[in-house]
Regions:
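A conserved ligand/cofactor-binding region detector
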Residues: 1-752
Length: 752
């Protein structure tokens, strides 16, 4: 392999020092692709196909350099020439192939599959504009297309192409591959992304609006196109079928190339269905097998023995149910198969709760996955128990052997080695590099003798990361941040169950408290980051309130020195890699029972933030690992919440009437906020909280404020706080996605 200088010299006939950052980025892109191209693809007989609507992979340059073992030498060569890798990275556009935790998990998982030397590819779609680019203007979210595709990128066009049949036409796909090199492995896997050459961005008008009926030109333009109308729902079905039909044809082709006669397909392939978006892969595989001469009974048996389903939510809205008539309109050739699968279920089980097609002729995708797959897993211990005992109990009673838990994880290469090199290098220095391959070795931090030196170093690393974030936000948004403040951070997609509205009510509490003369020991900066779906009005209203409070506080000289609210624009993986290492307080405040797992909680913990959270998702396992004294838990537990729902016993108006709560909620529609906000938005949110509050914000609000105030007080005892930080970092090893993927392989995939 050439040195970077030799590669640059050959490409530009210049030295590194003479090149612009743009030239160096393109050189490094191609240098990394060359290094990766020299690694063979994993070729084990059996392969996992991880099918997902999202892969939130983030910028790939540094991540790939780390995995290829080139990062340190490249960084040194650049530094010797007076160049900074972090500045060159700014040139790279972040791939817009995902939105939230689902897509980020998929990205961590394909990294770990490759790093463990397992044979497995991600399969998805190549969205041209992703979800959207968020612009914050007039205290509101606006949306524009997020253009990220360029002539030179990580995508490599392959020669594979498939015919995908719809009711009235057939589309021809193009397959693009992105290499996924494992961490210092001799081999690699790939992310396989299907696209259409006919897609045309000129049909986009006015933000992210476009003709939803022009399938040949719109199919892969956007992730999750607005489905608030019939055409939007149909487009989602077109997208999902395009993804799974291509994926299924790829699976069959690759198995045949390895010697399969298709009767033994399950010996060659396992399909992991990531949430319900890829569920049509089940009837599509059955269709393709029967077309190739396999009897229907055998085809069903084969598919049942090679598909596994990961459930990511108990929110009914997210468990997809498509009207049968929509499927008849888009994929009529799948409908007889789905009806036959449903007929077999109804012949055996009379309970309507487990039927695939319900009495309203809606097709329940998760039900099909459970009946016609061999594994169903939740993504955190609590989540899996809720599935077994509540949400999917009717299925658990039938198939207890199918249900298993696989607590989510994160790749430490992205979220520690890349995002927080200062901490990563310090851990190498005092613990050695063993944790790179076995994250449980971080526990050695607990027995490291010179605790005082560790605490001093952790303080300086956190201060460095706060300055780094402040510089980044100054460049990106022009916002000035006090780096001596406590950094309190909530970054995740906007949804009522994640309760950004509760954090906003805390901000109001703190604002009024400071106005009353109660000055905090040091300044507090509250960061929010996340996008709201364009059709999700209340989520947009929550963003509006946050931005209004930011303005009210900034314009109040009595409060501004002590409190600041920052909404990070267009939150993405890049922003997260600046925010997470700088964080003191990690906000994980979903209503108990609603967050399947969460992975932000793990990233913050690994980077030395303390969790403020409910007993929900993976917070439960974090609490078990670190102990009650090293996490800040508030709010009602999941059993209480589930019981309140079951009895319709929660009345938000009763909580609103409380002395500690009413002034905070009323402030949403106060003159101060209305002066900078939109009356319609603020009143709608206010009425939602006092009359409905489906995700029980007011139920937990008082306890949330109390525990957060305790946390702020505890922060002032730096010695005790840093003891807690050390425990959190040391215990984070369990949440490595390498551990999660090893468990998927051992219990579900059986690749080796």
């Amino acid at each position: 392999m050439l040195s970077l200088q030799e590669f640059v010299q050959n490409r530009y006939n210049k030295t590194i020092a003479e090149c612009s950052n743009e030239e160096l980025y393109l050189a490094l892109l191609n240098y990394s692709k060359l290094a990766s191209s020299q690694k063979p693809v994993n070729t084990g007989k059996k392969k996992v196909y991880y099918i997902s609507a999202e892969f939130l992979i983030g910028k790939l340059l540094s991540n790939n350099l780390i995995n290829l073992g080139l990062y340190d030498e490249v960084k040194k060569e650049l530094a010797d020439a007076g160049k900074e890798l972090i500045e060159i990275e700014e040139v790279e556009l972040e791939p817009s192939l995902g939105n939230g935790g689902l897509g980020r998990l998929a990205a961590c998982f394909i990294d770990s599959i490759s790093s463990l030397g397992l044979t497995g590819d991600g399969v998805g779609l190549n969205y041209h504009f992703g979800l959207f680019q968020q612009v914050l203007k007039n205290n509101q979210q606006e949306t524009i297309p997020n253009a990220w595709l360029t002539d030179q990128s990580w995508l490599v066009r392959s020669s594979r192409s498939y015919q995908v049949p719809f009711a009235d036409f057939t589309l021809t796909s193009t397959l693009y591959d992105i290499d996924v090199p494992g961490y210092k492995t001799a081999t690699k896997n790939r992310l396989r992304l299907f696209d259409l050459d006919s897609v045309d961005s000129s049909i986009i008008k006015d933000g992210i609006n476009f003709d939803k009926t022009d399938i040949a030109r719109n199919l892969t333009l956007f992730l999750y196109p607005d489905d608030s109308d019939r055409q939007g729902e149909l487009l989602r079905i077109f997208q999902q079928y395009f993804m799974v039909s291509n994926g299924a044809q790829l699976i069959i082709d690759e198995a045949i190339e390895k010697g399969s006669n298709l009767h033994d397909l399950a010996d060659y392939a396992v399909v992991q269905i990531n949430d319900t978006h890829p569920s049509m892969v089940i009837p599509e595989l059955i269709r393709l097998l029967t077309e190739r001469g396999i009897e229907l009974d055998e085809a069903i048996s084969i598919v049942r023995s090679m598909t596994a389903y990961t459930n990511h939510t108990i929110l009914a809205e997210a468990l997809e149910k498509w009207p049968l008539e929509f499927l008849e309109e888009v994929v009529p050739h799948l409908v007889p198969i789905i009806k036959e699968l449903d007929r077999r279920v109804k012949a055996e089980y009379k309970d309507p709760a487990v039927q695939i097609i319900d009495e309203n002729d809606r097709v329940h995708m998760a039900h099909m996955d459970i009946h016609y797959g061999y594994s169903v897993n939740g993504v955190a211990a609590l989540h899996t128990e809720i599935l077994k005992n509540s949400e999917l109990k009717a299925f658990y009673d039938i198939y207890p052997e199918k249900f298993n838990n696989k607590t989510n994880g994160i790749t430490f290469r992205r979220w520690l080695m890349h995002a927080n090199p200062s901490l990563s290098h310090y851990l190498d220095e005092i613990l050695g590099e063993g944790w790179h391959h076995d994250a449980s070795k971080l526990e050695d931090l607990l027995s490291y003798e010179d605790k005082a030196a560790v605490k001093e170093k952790l303080e300086s690393i956190k201060a460095h990361n706060k300055r780094k974030l402040a510089r980044h936000l100054k460049e990106q948004q022009g916002v000035e941040i006090k780096t001596n403040s406590i950094f309190d951070i909530q970054i995740k997609r906007l949804h009522e169950y994640k309760r950004q509205q509760m954090n906003a009510l805390y901000v109001i509490h703190k604002y009024l408290d400071i106005k009353a003369g109660n000055i905090p020991a040091r300044p507090i900066t509250v960061f929010f980051g996340g996008k709201a779906a364009p059709a999700y009005t209340i989520a947009q209203d929550i963003i509006h309130l946050i931005l209004c409070m930011s303005e009210v506080i900034a314009n109040d000289p009595a409060v501004a020195p002590h409190l600041q609210v920052v909404m990070v624009e267009n939150y993405n993986v890049t922003a997260a890699s600046f925010l997470i290492p700088a964080c003191d307080i990690s906000e994980q405040i979903s209503l108990a029972s609603k967050e399947a797992s969460g992975t932000g909680n793990m990233k913050f913990m690994l980077n030395g933030a303390l969790t403020l959270g409910t007993m929900d998702g993976a917070n439960v396992e974090i609490a078990e690992l670190v102990g009650d004294e090293n996490i800040y838990i508030f709010g009602e537990d999941s059993e209480t919440v589930i019981d309140l729902y079951a009895k319709s016993a929660y009345k938000s108006s009763e909580f609103y009437a409380r002395e500690a709560i009413k002034p905070l909620v009323d402030f949403i529609v106060s003159d101060a906020v209305l002066a900078v906000g939109k009356k319609e938005r603020l009143e709608r949110l206010y009425n939602e909280l006092i009359n409905k509050d489906w995700f029980m914000t007011l139920l937990d609000l008082e306890d949330y404020i109390k525990v957060k105030e305790q946390m702020l007080a505890d922060y002032e005892n730096r010695d005790a706080w840093l003891d807690k930080v050390i425990v959190n970092i040391a215990k984070a090893g369990f949440f490595s996605s390498d551990r999660t993927i090893a468990q998927y392989d051992e219990d579900i995939w059986h690749l080796n």
